[in-house]
Amino acid sequence: MLEQYVKKILTSRVYDVAVETPLQTARQLSERLGNQIWLKREDLQPVFSFKIRGAYNKLTQLSDAERARGVVTASAGNHAQGLALAAKVLGVRATIVMPKTTPEIKVEGVRSRGGKVVLHGDSFPEALAYSLKLVDEKGYVYIHPYDDPHTIAGQGTVAMEILRQHPGRLDAIFVPVGGGGLIAGIAAYVKYLRPEIKIIGVEPDDSNCLQAAMAAGERVVLPTVGIFADGVAVAQIGQHTFDICRDYVDEVITVSTDEICAAIKDIYDDTRSITEPAGALGVAGIKKYVEQRGVSGQTLVAIDSGANVNFDRLRHVAERAELGEGREAIIAVTIPEQPGSFKAFCEAIGKRQITEFNYRYNTGSEAHIFVGVQTHPENDPRSALIASLSEQGFPVTDLTDNELAKLHIRHMVGGHAARVSDEVVFRFEFPERPGALFNFLNKLGGRWNISMFHYRNHGAADGRVVAGLQVPANERHLVPAALAQIGYPYWDESDNPAYQLFLG
């Protein structure tokens, strides 16, 4: 099987539109990690993503009759832009079905390259179903974003370039994984020619379809998929791609949202370029691999796979990057509600930089303050800060990994609502598009009074809300069924310490 793919890769016609991207050393990251780190800069492609390779190679394999019918695909962005440009160069009509939640930068990217955009549904499965309907109705040829041998071969040209650009020692290549087209192509080429090189997939911990399939020994469908790294938000690994990955991918690492944000900053520090969340997975994976294995002196390559990110999402990335690096702690600290307490607390913090401070007067004998403090993962870790404050008589609750605190509570500190009774608190995610907030409130209905509400647009595909509902005790059993009818993911946060300390 590998030999067949290598032949396809060597004969792929990608360079009519794609460029050979540089393999660039990440000097600062290399020094920090004690390993030689290289970035394969696929964000420098004409469509700012590696996807142009597979899309163009697939189109070149179509017959004249198939090209005349026109092509269609479903995509949330990068494959769509790659196919639009490939079709334009080859003179083929391309229709791209995209979810209504697709970032505007990707929609405009498709239109500017000559693709016809059809916005349909709130998720990729809905867009996919509609694109297949167009295949039946219009006779279009469907171009799969990853699960096709010619697409896989096109993506495999990335590996061909890496081995040519770095013929010396190479210990591992870290590859972002969504549907698996990129890692399958890279694994096929590298394992045929240089089997000693490890191929390591990297996925978000809430979108790990390859890891789940490898563990099960077969393709599985994830019940839910996180969409922060929207470029790899895939519920099931492809069949063709898994056939390769099962035998030739050495391992899969998963990383958190905060770790992805930290990796985006790392890439920026070394290259002064901004990558999209999915594009930073390789670097995030290298950092975790080095930390967990304690390796040093190795040569490691990360595929920087794309840079199609909405500018307004960078606010969220900046907020979370220091947390992912272990350079900031988010804590709740209890101090006496009396003059001089603030000063005593600041003295206890010492020379550490305070990055965030939220407080509202409380009528009780104790005050709870929401604080961000700069830390250092090695010289002054979070654990040392918490231990120091506790020893000096300041009770601390660590909120660094608390999503409710990071997304909502930090913007809401304002005191307890003493006269609010029977309050239960839920966190929701819903598809982000114009009118989405109104639609969410409409679905929430009016059975129970809304006692608290916070929404913030993160420039992402999902809107995030925390809501307090006044539900009498004898009606609590009705809540799960009522929320299930809304149809959006939700989490019960009523017992969350951040809520209890600051708002409950």
Task: Outline where the language-model segments fall.
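PLP-dependent amino-acid enzyme catalytic core
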Residues: M1-A436, F440-G504
